[in-house]
């Protein structure tokens, strides 16, 4: 396959994808997809399971080189998954700076952990963290790299409802503070509307719909415009309005 992945910010977009295709055997998961994300823009990506959302995110994160087309992404980018993927044999603070050049910088790790509200857990082993704390540690690990692009692959899916609400608020706050572009893959329509500047719907390997979100922040699910947008997105997803969030 012809692979062209460029790490650059010398374009007006934080992400520029042209003619992207990815096949697994005879099945074409992504089919000539185009996508642009502006610097500092928060974009949420919705779609049915298996439509190619996570594959797209992995390509943008340079975790899947077997694609056709052109992908332009920032040199500084980070990714956080649904599973925090912390190394169990390293303390939390060490996990945060794992992979950074030079000697492990504890102070840098502590600053990142403080920012996500778990500075007091720097010296514990990952196995003693709650699900919400582990996800915060994963966010700290991503943000300590000072990314221009943050890729989030269903980071809240395994959290209970209350912890999920807190995690959503934290991500919104961190985005405002850091100003990086974010691409969030999610199955939760309300989450997408609450957080994003723009919501995309992926179907049959392409971006089938763009929905700009012009609501003021913080957003209210009881707002009639919120309900209208939710209904429109559910229509694109082929879901009855009373059947999903």
UniProtKB/Swiss-Prot annotation:
The keyword Signal does not apply. It catalyses: ATP + H2O + aliphatic sulfonate-[sulfonate-binding protein]Side 1 = ADP + phosphate + aliphatic sulfonateSide 2 + [sulfonate-binding protein]Side 1. Keywords: ATP-binding, Cell inner membrane, Cell membrane, Membrane, Nucleotide-binding, Plasmid, Translocase, Transport. It holds the Pfam family ABC_tran. SUPFAM superfamilies: P-loop containing nucleoside triphosphate hydrolases. Residues 15-229 form the ABC transporter domain. SMART domains: AAA. One of its GO terms (molecular function) is ATP hydrolysis activity. Its main location: membrane. ATP binds at residues 47-54. It is found in: Cell inner membrane. The keyword Mitochondrion does not apply. It is a peripheral membrane protein. Its EC number is 7.6.2.14. It comes from the Bacteria. One of its GO terms (cellular component) is plasma membrane. Belongs to the ABC transporter superfamily. Aliphatic sulfonates importer (TC 3.A.1.17.2) family. Part of the ABC transporter complex SsuABC involved in aliphatic sulfonates import. Responsible for energy coupling to the transport system. The complex is composed of two ATP-binding proteins (SsuB), two transmembrane proteins (SsuC) and a solute-binding protein (SsuA). This is Aliphatic sulfonates import ATP-binding protein SsuB 2. It comes from Paracoccus denitrificans (strain Pd 1222). The gene is ssuB2.
